[in-house]
């Protein structure tokens, strides 16, 4: 108990809350009512007046009732989109991309990359972006042939050389 008294003597006494309400925003004397409302609004204490009707949920005048046929069609479209996304996720086609058109090849994938890039470029040409894919495929093949000729000593050098070739090819 003596330690409590000593700490109270060192730190002082706590003041009680002001009973006159001086901490209330409503009681602040700011002049006219307009200034008071502006102050309260800026402090986030003002009450906003609702202008218009607030409707929660569907209202008959605003909602659109779908027929069974529309529901079936929408469900089929959603299922097909889901299947497409699951197929692309499970195939792993997008996993090897690091972003911004860069994909890092490992030693075993370099040989298969030539075959798969030809396959991918044929798919992309069907979609209508012939010129862009042809240019990027040529740049990729040029980078691969240059890397094979250089034959770096470590994997780190191989990665840096490939990245540099990618930067040089995309900059021109």
UniProtKB/Swiss-Prot annotation:
Q: In which tissues is it expressed?
A: Expressed in brain, heart, eye, liver, kidney and skeletal muscle.
Compositionally biased intervals (Polar residues): 80-92
**Start and end residues of each stretch annotated as Disordered:** 1-160
Compositional bias ranges of the Basic and acidic residues kind:
46-76, 112-122, 144-160
Record-stated family: Belongs to the SMAP family.
Q: What is this protein called?
A: Small acidic protein
Native organism is: Gallus gallus
């Amino acid at each position: 108990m003596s330690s409590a008294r000593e700490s109270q003597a060192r730190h002082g006494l706590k003041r009680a809350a002001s009973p006159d309400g001086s901490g209330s925003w409503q009681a602040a004397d700011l002049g006219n009512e307009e200034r008071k409302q502006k102050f309260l609004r800026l402090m986030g204490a003002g009450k906003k007046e609702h202008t218009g009707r607030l409707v929660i949920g569907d209202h008959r005048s605003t909602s659109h009732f779908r027929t069974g046929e529309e529901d079936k069609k929408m469900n089929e479209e959603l299922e097909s989109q889901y299947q497409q996304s699951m197929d692309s996720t499970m195939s792993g086609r997008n996993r090897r991309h690091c972003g911004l058109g860069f994909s890092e090849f490992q030693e075993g994938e370099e040989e298969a990359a030539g075959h798969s890039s030809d396959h991918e470029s044929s798919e992309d040409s069907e979609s209508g972006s012939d010129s862009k894919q042809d240019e990027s495929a040529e740049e990729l093949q040029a980078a691969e042939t240059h890397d094979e000729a250089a034959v770096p000593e470590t994997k780190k050098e191989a990665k840096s050389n490939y990245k540099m070739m990618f930067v040089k090819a995309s900059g021109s």
